[in-house]
Amino acid sequence: MDKIIVEGGQTQLQGQVVIEGAKNAVLPLLAATILPSQGKTLLTNVPILSDVFTMNNVVRGLDIQVDFNCDKKEILVDASGDILDVAPYEFVSQMRASIVVLGPILARNGHAKVSMPGGCTIGSRPIDLHLKGLEAMGATITQNGGDITAQAEKLKGANIYMDFPSVGATQNLMMAATLASGTTTIENAAREPEIVDLAQLLNKMGAKVKGAGTETLTIIGVDALHGTEHDVVQDRIEAGTFMVAAAMTSGNVLVKDAIWEHNRPLISKLMEMGVEVSEEEDGIRVKADTKKLKPVTVKTLPHPGFPTDMQAQFTALMAVVNGESTMIETVFENRFQHLEEMRRMGLQTEILRDTAMIHGGRALQGAPVMSTDLRASAALILAGMVAQGQTVVGQLTHLDRGYYQFHEKLAALGANIKRVSEA
């Protein structure tokens, strides 16, 4: 089992860092490669993450050829010919995002069986919106134990209103609708950049998707899709993590290839806090002096609100800012577990249901801490950089799901950090 050791206290990040393709984009893109019955699909700018290997295995388990060239960061998928309709439990159970294969398999084969997914232990994250939407399109859904079975000889276009703008449900229904007969409208759809990226891939495959990035999606079904090429969009959450890292260490960092528009909610709060953020030709520059920063109140919301996937990292920043900051988490319950670990480092915080009060400005102390989920692992490492003494972060399987060589990128910016293997 690996662990990360951080020697904190004097870290001031300087330089530039390159951002990978988005983890939250590439997983549904891989699910979409199930749809084309003709030709091959090439995905480029693919991040090398454990979740990507897991999703590759999910798709491969459908008797689809998947070749991952890690050196080129490319995945070539050939789904032409007959494919299986049962997603392999051993891989689906490892990752929440794997539920997005349900819609593509059903649309392609008329029948699909997928086990209840696994992944980070952040709240209940129910999949009822996925299932209600597919039922509206004519699917018969049955749940037996931990398995979900969906059947529909031919999906039919439908008007779907989602009670909540779920990213996963929007992706699942959008993909299923591409091969349905007639027109599907999804109201209150998720608007994240990863939704737009998926729609762009589907349209390159021959789909007719309109409205991606707005509250209303319209999909006109077609008879078949074909393979294509697509470059995965940059990871706004990785970019945001390094922006926060620069701010909390009084650093000066150019986050290369970061997209301003995708990070606008985070940038707005950084600037409100007093961080200097500027758009440059090849990325976003972040400069800060933590002594001059002021506390803020942040509420997580679906896009274009403040992203829940940046909540943990931002609370680490709040910890170094003098005064009382407030973080309100409205998207997922049970997403303040990292604060319990940061209490071991001396953080003073009170948590009441969906709200955390952060009493910042007091020096953190290095301590052994344990990652509780993907973004918490990054937050604890960032906290370790500004803490006095040594911080040891364990349970790195979470980190590897969403960050590629995180410790090496931080070290290149000046952090005193290393990753070691325990016997």
From Swiss-Prot:
Gene Ontology CC annotations of this record: cytoplasm
Recorded family membership: Belongs to the EPSP synthase family. MurA subfamily.
InterPro entries documented for this protein: Enolpyruvate_Tfrase_dom, Enolpyruvate_Tfrase_sf, MurA_subfamily, RNA3'P_cycl/enolpyr_Trfase_a/b, UDP_GlcNAc_COvinyl_MurA
Record-level GO BP terms: cell division; cell wall organization; peptidoglycan biosynthetic process; regulation of cell shape; UDP-N-acetylgalactosamine biosynthetic process
Residues with the 2-(S-cysteinyl)pyruvic acid O-phosphothioketal modification: 120
Signal peptide range in chain numbering: none
Cross-referenced SUPFAM superfamilies: EPT/RTPC-like
Entry keyword rRNA processing: no
Positions bound to phosphoenolpyruvate: 23-24
CDD domains to which the protein is assigned, alphabetical: UdpNAET (cd01555)
Xref: Gene3D superfamilies: Enolpyruvate transferase domain
Pfam assignment, any one: EPSP_synthase
Keyword annotations from UniProtKB, A to Z: Cell cycle, Cell division, Cell shape, Cell wall biogenesis/degradation, Cytoplasm, Peptidoglycan synthesis, Pyruvate, Transferase
Record-listed E.C. numbers: 2.5.1.7
Associated pathway: Cell wall biogenesis; peptidoglycan biosynthesis
Protein role: Cell wall formation. Adds enolpyruvyl to UDP-N-acetylglucosamine.
Cellular compartments annotated: Cytoplasm
Enzyme class at the top of the EC tree: transferase
A single GO molecular function term of this UniProt record: UDP-N-acetylglucosamine 1-carboxyvinyltransferase activity
Catalytic activity entry: phosphoenolpyruvate + UDP-N-acetyl-alpha-D-glucosamine = UDP-N-acetyl-3-O-(1-carboxyvinyl)-alpha-D-glucosamine + phosphate
Active site (catalytic residues): 120
Domain of life according to the entry: Bacteria
Membrane-spanning intervals of the chain: none
Annotated protein name in UniProt: UDP-N-acetylglucosamine 1-carboxyvinyltransferase 2
